[in-house]
């Protein structure tokens, strides 16, 4: 299972893994790296209309280097930086040591 669609913070990634995702598409976070080739632009693949071509060009503001985005350190609590460290911390807080264990987390779904 590959989770895609609006994955912009470490919280989104953590929830996708807990729901069983094997991988997570993170176009927006990677596009926010200073060294990203698109310089803040990326091609979002959301379907705008069923009969029209998929996707749209999306602009995001650079927030740090690729290493900072993936590995930290985080300078704020937005969840946009240190994605792997935040996932590891969330797994530890939930009592899981591996991604495979986290993928089997018991979930509670509440209606609103």
Give names to the regions the model predicted:
Residues 1-3, 8-112:
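Alpha/beta catalytic cores of nucleotide-metabolism and tRNA/nucleoside-modifying enzymes
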């Amino acid at each position: 299972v590959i989770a895609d669609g609006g994955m912009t913070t470490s919280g989104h990634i953590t929830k996708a893994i807990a729901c069983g995702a094997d991988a997570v598409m993170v176009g927006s976070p990677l596009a926010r790296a200073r060294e990203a080739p698109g310089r803040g632009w990326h091609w979002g693949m959301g379907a705008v209309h069923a009969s029209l071509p998929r996707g749209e060009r999306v602009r995001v503001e650079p927030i740090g280097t690729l290493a900072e985005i993936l590995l930290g350190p985080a300078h704020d609590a937005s969840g946009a930086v240190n994605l792997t460290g935040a996932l590891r911390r969330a797994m530890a807080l939930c009592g899981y040591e591996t991604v495979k264990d986290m993928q089997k987390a018991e979930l509670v779904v509440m209606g609103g």
